[in-house]
Every structure is written in C-alpha cells, then in structure tokens.
Amino acid sequence: MTAAAPRPLVVVGDVLLDQDIDGEATRLAPDAPAPVVDVDVDRSRPGGAGLAAMLAARQGREVVLVTALGDDTASQTVRNALTPGVRLVELPLDGTLPVKTRIRAGGRPLVRVDRGGGTPG
C-alpha cells in the first residue's frame, strides 16, 4: 500500500500589493506642517490571499492561488513575488490591483495611502 500524494492547498481570494516605506522624519516640509520622511527601506509584497499563499508555500506546501490579476505594474509585482513557489490561476481584473502603502518614521505609522481597486472581470 502506498501513501497518497499530498494534495495542494488551494487559496481563493483577493490579492493586493502591500508596500512598506520606513525612514526617519527629522524636519517639516516648508510648504505644509507635515513631516518629511527620508526613506531607508522600501519593501513590497503580496497581501490578502497572496500573503496567505506565499506563507504556506514557504512552509513547503504545494499551493494554488485563484485570484484576479491585471496588466498593471502592481499585478506584475505580485506575479513575480509569488512564482515559482505558488501556482497561479488568474481571473481577469478590470482596473488596477489595489496597493496599500504604509509610511512609517522612526517605527511609528504616519499615514496609509490606498490606490487602485479593480473588480474581477
């Protein structure tokens, strides 16, 4: 008797691109009472269902992700980050992939900027 091959983990859901910008704010902008952040680190990674799929693949699981992706830069960044570890089953996306950008200074959140937000086609 042989053991059955492990089945892949199938993740279905919305993906977004998470961006984290970290730096230091030691001065205010001359044109507004807002901090100026000198960027030390700028990271991007899949978020939402993409993060769940990526973390499972890092643990050695075979993972299939079913999600909507488009032709925009954020979608391509997510594709590049997920392959080769995650097999993608892509649905069409009308519009652009959501991007959530968090800006921190000295380890403290200053602002989150949301962009994009297409709908599955």
Model-found features: residue ranges?
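A short acidic-Thr-Gly-centered motif at the start of a beta-strand
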Residues: M1-A5
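Active-site glycine-centered loops adjacent to acidic/histidine catalytic or metal-binding residues
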Residues: D14
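Conserved N-terminal subdomain of the carbohydrate kinase-like
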Residues: P8-L9, L17-G121
